[in-house]
Amino acid sequence: MSLIEIEFERPGNPVDTIETVAALNDWAFERSDDDEITISLGGSWCDYHVSFSWMEEVEALHLACAFDLKVTEPRKTEVLRLLALVNEQLWMGHFDLWHKENVIMFRQSLLLSGGAEASSAQIEGMLPNALVNCERCYQAFQ
């Protein structure tokens, strides 16, 4: 039997850990279902809405940080080029243009395959990484 065929029992939902971290830090949050939570945090340039989604089928915790910055059609090509240049400089996560809403978002995933659990330290590391990058690049995307 290969390691790929072994099924692991996951002790808990990583979103539960995020909810605990958010509550301990007095962050405003909304738990929309068992596998998703959104945290609202104020930044220097705007308010950020950070969604964490647990995707069990790929055993990954996905972070998406959107900010209220709509990209108009005439600027779309320019912004996509800028996103590519910015993404070249990032070690973790990336910026993306969500075409459905024409908003820029920062995305990052934490792979938790084989029954691994997300620690509060990992979660507390993902969030500042997203916010620091959003704050650093916000004005360039305007």
Residue ranges of model-derived segments:
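Ser/Thr-rich, low-complexity intrinsically disordered terminal regions
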Residues: 20, 24-68
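Long, contiguous binding/interaction regions
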Residues: 116, 122-136, 140
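Short, internal acidic amphipathic alpha-helical interface segments
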Residues: 66-103
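Ordered, soluble secondary-structure elements with a strong preference for glycine-centered loop motifs
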Residues: 8, 12, 73-77, 116-124
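Short, aliphatic-rich beta-strand segments
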Residues: 104-108
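Long, hydrophobic, amphipathic alpha-helical segments used as structural scaffolds
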Residues: 33, 91-94, 98, 137-142
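A generic structural motif
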Residues: 67-71, 110-119
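Terminal, regulation- and interaction-focused segments at domain boundaries
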Residues: 1-21
